[in-house]
Structure formats: structure tokens, C-alpha cells
């Protein structure tokens, strides 16, 4: 049976976490025993169970038949709780400012699909979580990495961001705490990145 050819767009997308899956499956077929470090899935390991209060809440929701489609923007109680949490961090956030997604991966797809055009650039920290590289490619954009200083605990190199700014940059991505380095950016560093972005009207952080 002939395979269906992938589109040029799909063929050009890089996704490091998944790129190793097919070769790994081949090695397993050959009898090799692999330790899979390509993806973080702590709940799949013994000793890290789902918290009991979450299991109980899920059971109760099923028993109430409260398991249909939710509101488009997310459950209102959840959005209000998120808004209140953000208010403790100094943001005058309201529930109308909150859009609930199934994790950061879906959030990235929504953001990039909504705002990126052909030829746009996303500045993202390097190293980074693979979707920051893969998803802009889906929409005709590209990702350029800005440096993290390993000698300073993987701190954001704001000078490198300045060097890489131009009119094509639509997003500067700040991952805080950073995945995979674990670095937590100082408030002064985030303010500096915001200051850089203000000089470029097309750019959002």
C-alpha cells in the first residue's frame, strides 16, 4: 500500500520530543530495553499518583453527569479562581481576561494561530520546549532562539534579545520558571524585556 505523502509544511516541522519516537520503536522491536527521557510524564511513574482530592472531584463530576462540553472560554468558577491568583501577583486580572486551555501546548497553538503571519518571527529561549520551535513553522513563521546564560544559572540574556529584535518579531517568549533549565527570572529581568518590546510596536511578550 502506498503511503499518503505529507504536505511540505508538515515535512518541514521539527519537534524534538517526537522525532525520536519512530527510531525508539524500532529499537524496542529489536529487543532493546529503553529508558524514555524524551518527555516528562511524572504521573506515569510509581510513587507520583494523582492527588486523591483530584480523583474524588473527578468521580463526583462524573456522577453528576457534569462531563459535557464546557463553556468556550472555560468554566467561570475556574476563570475567577485563576484571575484571583493572578491578582496576588500584581496584575489587575478579571475573569474576562482568562481563557482556559488544555495545557500550554493548546495555548501556544491558539496564540500562534491567532497572531502569526507568513514571515513573522518568534524569539524564544534556547534551550526550550519544542512547541516553541514547531508551532510557528505551522503558520509560516520562524523561531529564533535568544541565549540563556549558563554561567548565571541560565538567566535570560537581555543583550542577546536586543541584538535579535527587528520588525518581523511578533512575540518574545518568556518561560518562567524555564523549561527545561528551571531558572526563575528576576522581576527586574522581566521588566527589562518588557522595556525592549515597547520599542517595537509589532511585538507582544
Where are these regions (language model features)?
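Short beta-strands and strand-loop turn motifs
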Residues: 35-39, 145-147, 172-177
Amino acid at each position: 500500500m502506498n503511503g499518503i505523502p505529507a504536505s511540505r509544511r508538515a515535512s518541514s516541522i521539527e519537534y524534538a520530543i517526537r522525532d525520536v519516537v519512530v527510531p525508539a520503536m524500532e529499537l524496542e522491536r529489536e529487543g532493546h530495553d529503553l529508558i524514555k527521557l524524551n518527555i516528562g510524564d511524572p504521573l506515569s511513574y510509581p510513587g507520583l499518583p494523582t492527588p486523591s482530592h483530584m480523583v474524588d472531584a473527578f468521580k463526583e463530576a462524573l456522577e453528576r453527569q457534569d462531563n459535557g462540553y464546557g463553556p468556550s472560554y472555560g468554566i467561570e468558577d475556574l476563570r475567577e479562581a485563576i484571575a484571583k491568583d493572578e491578582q496576588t501577583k500584581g496584575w489587575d486580572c478579571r475573569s474576562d481576561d482568562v481563557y482556559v486551555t488544555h495545557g500550554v501546548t493548546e495555548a501556544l497553538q491558539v496564540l500562534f494561530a491567532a497572531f502569526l503571519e507568513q514571515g513573522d518571527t518568534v524569539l524564544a529561549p534556547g534551550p526550550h520546549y519544542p512547541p516553541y520551535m514547531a508551532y510557528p513553522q505551522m503558520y509560516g513563521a520562524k523561531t529564533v532562539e535568544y541565549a540563556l546564560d549558563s554561567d548565571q544559572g541560565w538567566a535570560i540574556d537581555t543583550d542577546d534579545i536586543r541584538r535579535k529584535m527587528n520588525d518581523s518579531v511578533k512575540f518574545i517568549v518568556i518561560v518562567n520558571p524555564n523549561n527545561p533549565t528551571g531558572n526563575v527570572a528576576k522581576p527586574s529581568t522581566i521588566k527589562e524585556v518588557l522595556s525592549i518590546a515597547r520599542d517595537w510596536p509589532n511585538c507582544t511578550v
